[in-house]
Amino acid sequence: MNKKVIIKNIGLIDYKEAWDYQESLFDEIVSIKDRNRKAEVQEESYNYLIFCEHPHVYTIGKSGKLENLLISEDFLKSKGATLHKINRGGDITYHGPGQIVGYPILDLDNFGVSIKNYIDGLEEVIIRALQHYDIIATRSAGATGVWLDADDPIKARKISAIGVRTSHWVSMHGFAFNINTNLDYFGYIVPCGIQGKSVTSLEKELGRKIDIEEVHQILKKEFSNVFDMEFVMK
């Protein structure tokens, strides 16, 4: 199994441009897998882990409902935001500057995980990353993502959202981890379609600005620990 992963930090990038880039890497891996089914000599495919940030944007997954966007499209535009309906699982979420978005484009056959275990693994990466800041985070029953005080109906707040797409056992999309995020933008939606729950950020929890590059390095370490990845340059 090839657990080599090419990691790229592409910085601030338009959502559609990043989506197209994901699709190209996804299609590359699927094509190699298809060729390998018929070939005597197996061709090696790479896995990818992309870190980036986006300008203000809302995305709605396949099961999402437009009524969970609480503002008109005109008001949305006045806030400098865009809206995209996309092919991941889940409902509506927000991406913006100060938020780390991670797109693992992986051949899951290489990692020996089910789709459920893969999503659990993404959550585990974030949970472990938060431990570096002495923050205890957990999963929440019946909801994806990473939460603080998940069992307290009043205090429960989400710090990382997760939504993925898989086909041919290849993954795309991934997670959004609130670091220095402007949380006001979450007030214009019902985040992930879950009523009555709030969101938070690492900055809000610690009361200070966070070095995003430091978080990148922590995430890289925990991806390696959780998925036994070997990072390579290309």
What are the residue ranges of the model-derived segments?
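Glycine/proline-rich loop-helix segments at beta-alpha junctions forming the active-site rim
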Residues: 157, 176, 181-184, 190-192
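C-terminal accessory segment of soluble enzyme catalytic cores
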Residues: 147, 184-234
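Conserved phosphate/anionic-ligand binding catalytic regions in large, soluble enzymes, centered on
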Residues: 167-179
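N-terminal lobe of the biotin/lipoate ligase/transferase fold
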Residues: 1-156, 210, 232
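Histidine/acidic-rich helix-loop-helix segments that form or flank divalent-metal centers
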Residues: 159-162
